[in-house]
Amino acid sequence: IWDSTISINLTAQWHLIRAMEPLLIAAPAGRAVLVSSGVAERIAPFWGPYAISKAGLEAMGRVWAGETEQTNLRINMISPGGTATGMRASAFPGEDPDSLPQPDDIAPAFLTLLSPNCQDHGKRFKARSMLGL
Protein backbone atom coordinates (compact mmCIF):
# COMPACT_ATOMS: atom_id res chain seq x y z
CA ILE A 1 0.00 0.00 0.00
CA TRP A 2 2.84 2.39 0.86
CA ASP A 3 4.57 2.28 -2.52
CA SER A 4 1.43 2.61 -4.62
CA THR A 5 -0.04 5.39 -2.48
CA ILE A 6 3.15 7.46 -2.46
CA SER A 7 3.66 6.78 -6.17
CA ILE A 8 0.19 8.01 -7.13
CA ASN A 9 -0.38 10.81 -4.62
CA LEU A 10 3.12 12.27 -4.43
CA THR A 11 5.63 11.02 -7.01
CA ALA A 12 3.25 11.25 -9.99
CA GLN A 13 2.20 14.73 -8.88
CA TRP A 14 5.84 15.84 -8.78
CA HIS A 15 6.43 14.56 -12.33
CA LEU A 16 3.22 16.22 -13.55
CA ILE A 17 4.22 19.52 -11.95
CA ARG A 18 7.67 19.43 -13.56
CA ALA A 19 6.21 18.55 -16.96
CA MET A 20 3.49 21.22 -16.89
CA GLU A 21 5.34 24.04 -15.14
CA PRO A 22 6.74 25.70 -18.30
CA LEU A 23 3.27 25.84 -19.87
CA LEU A 24 1.64 27.11 -16.69
CA ILE A 25 4.26 29.83 -16.24
CA ALA A 26 3.96 30.88 -19.90
CA ALA A 27 0.18 31.21 -19.59
CA PRO A 28 -1.15 34.68 -18.73
CA ALA A 29 -3.00 33.20 -15.73
CA GLY A 30 -1.67 29.70 -15.07
CA ARG A 31 -3.37 27.97 -12.16
CA ALA A 32 -2.64 24.71 -10.36
CA VAL A 33 -4.85 23.19 -7.69
CA LEU A 34 -3.45 20.24 -5.78
CA VAL A 35 -6.08 17.99 -4.19
CA SER A 36 -5.30 17.29 -0.56
CA SER A 37 -7.30 15.78 2.28
CA GLY A 38 -8.23 16.55 5.85
CA VAL A 39 -6.01 13.66 6.97
CA ALA A 40 -2.99 15.76 5.94
CA GLU A 41 -3.51 17.98 8.98
CA ARG A 42 -4.80 15.64 11.68
CA ILE A 43 -3.83 12.36 13.26
CA ALA A 44 -5.63 9.63 11.32
CA PRO A 45 -4.88 6.15 12.71
CA PHE A 46 -4.58 3.46 10.03
CA TRP A 47 -4.40 6.08 7.27
CA GLY A 48 -0.60 6.42 7.38
CA PRO A 49 0.43 6.17 3.72
CA TYR A 50 -2.51 8.26 2.51
CA ALA A 51 -2.12 10.93 5.20
CA ILE A 52 1.63 11.14 4.67
CA SER A 53 1.21 11.39 0.89
CA LYS A 54 -1.29 14.24 1.23
CA ALA A 55 0.84 16.08 3.81
CA GLY A 56 3.78 15.70 1.45
CA LEU A 57 1.70 17.00 -1.44
CA GLU A 58 0.79 20.09 0.57
CA ALA A 59 4.46 20.69 1.42
CA MET A 60 5.36 20.26 -2.24
CA GLY A 61 2.66 22.75 -3.21
CA ARG A 62 3.95 25.35 -0.74
CA VAL A 63 7.53 24.88 -1.96
CA TRP A 64 6.40 25.14 -5.59
CA ALA A 65 4.45 28.29 -4.75
CA GLY A 66 7.60 29.78 -3.24
CA GLU A 67 9.61 28.86 -6.32
CA THR A 68 7.10 30.55 -8.63
CA GLU A 69 6.34 33.62 -6.52
CA GLN A 70 7.63 36.01 -9.21
CA THR A 71 5.47 34.53 -12.00
CA ASN A 72 1.80 34.74 -12.99
CA LEU A 73 1.31 31.12 -11.88
CA ARG A 74 -0.88 30.65 -8.81
CA ILE A 75 -0.72 27.37 -6.90
CA ASN A 76 -3.10 26.34 -4.15
CA MET A 77 -4.18 23.22 -2.33
CA ILE A 78 -7.76 22.16 -1.66
CA SER A 79 -9.28 19.59 0.66
CA PRO A 80 -12.67 18.52 -0.71
CA GLY A 81 -13.90 17.15 2.61
CA GLY A 82 -16.17 14.14 2.78
CA THR A 83 -17.69 13.71 -0.67
CA ALA A 84 -19.83 10.93 -2.14
CA THR A 85 -17.23 9.15 -4.27
CA GLY A 86 -16.33 5.53 -4.90
CA MET A 87 -13.14 5.94 -2.89
CA ARG A 88 -15.11 7.28 0.06
CA ALA A 89 -17.62 4.42 -0.17
CA SER A 90 -14.76 1.89 -0.12
CA ALA A 91 -13.16 3.52 2.90
CA PHE A 92 -16.43 4.01 4.80
CA PRO A 93 -18.82 1.27 3.63
CA GLY A 94 -21.32 1.94 6.43
CA GLU A 95 -21.66 5.64 5.66
CA ASP A 96 -24.80 6.86 3.92
CA PRO A 97 -23.55 8.47 0.67
CA ASP A 98 -26.69 10.60 0.54
CA SER A 99 -25.44 12.40 3.66
CA LEU A 100 -22.45 13.77 1.72
CA PRO A 101 -22.12 16.40 -1.00
CA GLN A 102 -21.77 15.08 -4.53
CA PRO A 103 -18.62 15.93 -6.52
CA ASP A 104 -20.67 18.41 -8.58
CA ASP A 105 -21.60 20.19 -5.34
CA ILE A 106 -17.97 20.98 -4.50
CA ALA A 107 -16.76 21.65 -8.06
CA PRO A 108 -17.41 25.42 -7.76
CA ALA A 109 -14.68 25.65 -5.09
CA PHE A 110 -12.18 24.21 -7.56
CA LEU A 111 -13.38 26.57 -10.28
CA THR A 112 -12.87 29.55 -7.97
CA LEU A 113 -9.22 28.60 -7.46
CA LEU A 114 -8.73 27.92 -11.18
CA SER A 115 -10.17 31.29 -12.19
CA PRO A 116 -7.84 33.93 -13.66
CA ASN A 117 -9.28 36.24 -10.98
CA CYS A 118 -7.87 34.10 -8.16
CA GLN A 119 -4.75 35.73 -6.77
CA ASP A 120 -4.30 33.43 -3.77
CA HIS A 121 -0.98 31.61 -3.89
CA GLY A 122 0.44 28.83 -1.75
CA LYS A 123 -2.66 28.50 0.40
CA ARG A 124 -4.75 25.56 1.55
CA PHE A 125 -8.52 25.73 1.25
CA LYS A 126 -11.39 23.57 2.47
CA ALA A 127 -13.93 23.20 -0.35
CA ARG A 128 -16.90 22.73 1.93
CA SER A 129 -16.02 25.85 3.95
CA MET A 130 -15.56 27.90 0.77
CA LEU A 131 -19.07 26.92 -0.30
CA GLY A 132 -20.78 27.07 3.07
CA LEU A 133 -21.55 23.33 3.07
Regions found by a protein language model. Name each.
Residues 1, 25, 31-56, 61-70, ...:
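Catalytic loop of short-chain dehydrogenase/reductase
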Residues 1-7:
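Active-site Tyr-X3-Lys motif and surrounding loop/helix of classical short-chain dehydrogenase/reductase
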Residues 17-18, 62:
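A short, exposed helix-loop element centered on a Lys and neighboring polar residues
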Residues 19-23:
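A structural motif corresponding to the C-terminal end of an alpha-helix
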Residues 70-73, 77-78, 85, 94-133:
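C-terminal helical subdomain
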